[in-house]
Amino acid sequence: MRFHAHMVLRSVCGPHAHMSTWPFFALVLFSKVIGHAALKAKLIGNIREGRVAHAQLFMGPRGGGNLAMALAYARYLLCQDRDTVDACGKCSSCLQMNKLEHPDVHLEFPIFFTDKVKVCEPFTPQWRQTVLAEPYLDVEQWRDRLESENKQLRMGVDIAQEIQRKLSLRSFMGGYKVMLIWLPELMDAAAANKLLKVLEEPEPNTVFLLVSTDAEQLLATILSRAQLVKVSALRPTELVEAL
């Protein structure tokens, strides 16, 4: 049986509890991501051994922790003083990741379009704030934060062009550039095809972290170019142990 993290939390702490009541979530380190010990060890080992795939698909059910895991991975990848189990949490890179403001970590996510706004940039401060409070964010929570009511959240060709523009920039700190795309399955066909072209001809030292809850909605050609990172559903015992 699958359990949404928020559902189990509320069953333990009460109907009004949510992830932001646990302040340790604000710093997304591997040690703060609930459960998934074997997967964490594998991801850490891959980085330490220099096996960093240029495109990785963090796939899992809603509320299972795939976004939190991808953020912890990005932090560890960019950490300047990481050890064998986690990022240091203290270097300049980690301090920037504490606020999701690392200049080499680019964030893309679905939005609702207006006549004037069709890219993520104007929404980025709000998305950062939301994710820092709710690393187990799902699309309904994000829609509520945007107060978009019944408007459709999506990613259009303008966002794909925004991705290309960001990737054309040099690495600010001279290492990896990370492009984290949350819910790429909400890209329209034109945007997905543009993303595919970027994945086919990646810039050096660029890592794509695609965070998805519905791989069936992604282009098969995108799936074929991304290394699968399967983030399984949380068990209620894992969430209770984290309290």
Regions found by a protein language model. Give the residues of each.
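Conserved AAA+ ATPase "SRH/arginine-finger" region at the nucleotide-binding site
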Residues: 228-237
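Short regulatory helix/loop adjacent to the ATP-binding pocket of P-loop NTPases
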Residues: 194-199, 215-225
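Loop/turn-to-beta-strand initiation segments
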Residues: 173-178, 203-209
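Short hydrophobic alpha-helical segments enriched in small aliphatic residues
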Residues: 5-7, 14-19, 26
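Conserved D-loop-proximal element of ABC-family nucleotide-binding domains
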Residues: 189-190, 204, 220
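Conserved AAA+ ATPase "sensor/coupling" helix adjacent to the nucleotide-binding pocket
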Residues: 225, 241-243
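A short beta-strand-to-loop transition that corresponds to the Sensor-1 phosphate-sensing loop
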Residues: 182-183, 210-215, 235
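Clamp-loader machinery-focused feature within the broader ASCE/P-loop NTPase space
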Residues: 29-190
